[in-house]
Structures are given as C-alpha cells and as structure tokens.
Amino acid sequence: TQDKELLAKKGISEAQIAEQLACFEKGFPYLKLDAAASVEKGILAPATDEQEAYLAAWDAYKNTDKTIVKFVPASGAASRMFKNLFEFLGADYERPTTKFEQAFFEGIDKFAFYDDLNVACRRMAGKDIPGLMGEGNYKAVVAALLEEAGLNYGALPKGLLKFHKYEEGSRTPLEEHLAEGAMYAAGKSGKVNVHFTVSTEHRELFKVLVAEKAGEFAKRYGVEYNITFSEQKPSTDTIAADMDNQPFRDNGKLLFRPGGHGALIENLNDLDADIIFIKNIDNVVPDRLKADTVLYKKLIAGVLVALQKQTFEYLELLDSGDYSHDQVMEILQFVQKSLFCKNPETKNLEDSELAMYLKKKLNRPMRVCGMVKNVGEPGGGPFLAYNSDGTISLQILESSQIDMNNAAAKEMFEKGTHFNPVDLVCAVRDYKGHKFDLVNYVDKATGFISYKSKNGKDLKALELPGLWNGAMSDWNTVFVEVPLSTFNPVKTVNDLLREQHQ
C-alpha cells in the first residue's frame, strides 16, 4: 500500500512501472545508421542570398498573429560547475595547487560575481578577497562562494549565477536569455514569451529575479515580457532497479529518479505556441558578442517557417484530392530532398498509396536544428538513421545510442563533421491550426540505462529518451550549419574566464 500511495502521489501507473522494469530487463537497441550527416548530406549551409530570403521569411512571420515562445531548460543545479572547487575545499593542502585552482585564483577579479564574493568574504571571514589570499586563506574564499552562509553558488541553478560583467552591473544567464528573446523572438505586438523549466526549490528565486529585472529589459528593448515557469512532472520520474532488475528499495521504499531532459517533452507539450526556440540556460554571451547568435537564430527560424509554409501547401493539395501524378512526384522530392526523409519502398507505391504515405510524413511536428563543425572530440551529433518503419531520417544521437563494437558505425561516429549544440526551433501546430500532441512522436526505444549508487548500494537508473534525441525522433528534422561563435556553454566556473564570457 505504501507503494501504491507513492505511485498515486506521483501520477505513475503500475503499467508504466512494468514497462520500465522491462526496459531494464531487455536494455535498449542501438540505432541502425545510414551515415553521419554532413554539409553534402543532410546539413544545409545557405549561401548569402538564400540567407537573406530566410531572414526575410522570419521577419514576415514575426509580424503575424502567431505565438513565439523561447523555451529554456534551467532546472539543473550548478554544482557540477564547481566540482574542482569542492575538491579543493576537501584537499589536504591549503594553497591552489592544480592548474584549475591556480587559474581560478589568478583570474578571480575577472568574475562577474567578484564584488558579491568580496562582500560575502567580509561577512564570513572578516576580510576581503585580497586580504584572505594574502594570508594564504584561499579556502575561506571558496567557502564564501559555494556555501549557504556565503553566496551559496554550490547549490543554486546556473540561471541565477552572475556570468557577465557590464558597466551597469553583472548579468545572470536568465537576464541574457531575456535580452536574447527581445532580439529575435518578439512577436507582432512586441511581446516576448520566455518559459523556463525550473526545480521546485528554486522557483521562488527565479520569480524574484524576474520581478527585479524584467522591467528594465522591457524598457531597454521596447518589448513586453511574458515570463512563465514550469517544473518537471513527478509522473516522468523513473523507477530505479537493482542489479537483478527488480525495483530498488531504499529502507523499504521504492526509489524514483528524475528521468532526464527527455521529461521536458511534457512541459513543451503544455505550451500554447506556434513556434518554440530551445536553447540551454548556460549557452549565453555578453551583448557585444550576441550578433552571431541572433543572426543564426533568425536564420534557422526562417528555414523552419519556409519549410512549414511549403509543407502546409502540399497538405492542402493532398487533402483536396485534386492533384496530378507530377504533383505527387514533386511532393515526394520535397520530402526526400528538403526534409531528408527517404523510404526505399516508395518506388513500388501507386499514386493513391503514395499520397497517403506523404500526408503521414508531412503532417508531423517539425524542427530545424543548428549544427556546429566539430573542433574537438566527437560528441552527440547529427546522423541519418533508420526508423522502425524502414524510412531513413535525420536524428540527433548520443554516443550511447551507437554500437561502438560495430566498426562501420564507430567510424561514422568518429568521422562526424558536426556536433549538436542544442539550438533548435520547433513548429508544433498542424496545417489546420491544431496543436500536435508531442507525446505521440517520442520513440520509446531510445532511452538509456546508467549505473549509480544510493547509500553504497548499486542501482540502475533509467533515462528517458533525450528531449532533442528520442523524444523528437518522429519529427520532421532539418539541420543547418551554424558557427562555433553561437556555442559558448559554461561547464566549469573557469569557463567564465574565457574571452567569450568577459
């Protein structure tokens, strides 16, 4: 009964639990690859004149009555950003010793949170930063940054940390996203809709910051903000299993864990929007570097609305029943060449069957994703992969979805020319103006299993299909090359010392 109460409270059915335990039992299949996507194959790199047309298409779209939303996943704690500094606090030496520690203290006055940290040091240790460093008390400085009695950066989400310095003060990523939203996502009436997914314990802090700052950004950019929040739903938590694939129990209680960013497909599905931009909270730059980001956001949005317009026209034509063989061939070309969706079976179909197939493929949510040229190690990236219905389409895959024991697949992964910076624009209504139910377009067979421990006991955790991976598997997907300058994530605190964040 305790189990049943917990399930009821979370809104999880027993059938879901059975399904999840079966996933632990049988694992997840690897995806069959056709090729790594490249500029010749699946990634658009529009020439200057084409870019102009796409930018114009976006400007025209923004001036209609459509609803545009900027969606920013922002629930994760920033603790990973400070992993090295937490290790320094626990180390058996007092002075900065590793390269990381030295870089942090050498650049300390360059951080946007320096002034706040100075105040916290005085409050906690009675001295400012130079004073503490001068007497070799480096750990007091780090403690003031990370601990609750100080700035509490070790427990806050990235969106609320000071990232960038300006003449008039410092900005958090939340504020940088508000600025960005005004620059490329303002609708006809100058309204900017920004939606953050946050964790329950931080929601109030986000609200306070918005209440404090939204007015000044609205004034600066001549826009009106509509800022909303949601939380990951408890019903998307997944059950943990023991090594025998039985439900893991912690003191007799079933253990549930958050299902990863794939759970946010539910939050996305709840938005009332026509077009949704998605970008991670920590991928922001100061205003002086925003031009590229804004240009390429408008560009991929322009590609999206241009493709959507053509798709809708073809769907209307197929609906009318009044089309020629040549028109059906034209639509097939569009699906294969513009939407990169191929099916070896299509050549055997009569026109009427082909029309049904095309209608099914066209009438789906659509996304255009920016892709950046690989500079370092291959990571998650763009591939042409086989779907369960035998078609080949574009997918964003993580390395865990690729069979590295298969030489051909491994080579495709290693030779991949581009990676996924998480830079998407999504179209979520059909040609009749109805919202797609996004839950219907998830490929459930694309989750993955990770190994964790709880109180010293090993457990298996189930990650849902990633938001831009399997959760959007059955969308029409198009990739566009964007420059590295649009990708500036902050993985560690010292990333803030990089030129792009100064």
What name fits each language-model region?
Residues L178-A182, N406-A409, L464:
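Short amphipathic beta-strand starts and helix->beta connectors
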Residues E5-L7, G11, A36-V375, L384-I396, ...:
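Domain-scale recognition of functional cores that engage charged ligands
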Residues I276, Y386-P421, D430, T446-Y451:
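C-terminal, active-site-flanking charged/polar segments
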Residues V372, G381, A407:
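Polyanion-binding interface signature
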Residues K127-E135, E148, Y153, D282, ...:
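Conserved catalytic alpha/beta cores of large enzymes that bind or transform nucleotide phosphates
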Residues T1-V39, A186, L349, E353, ...:
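Long, compositionally biased intrinsically disordered regions
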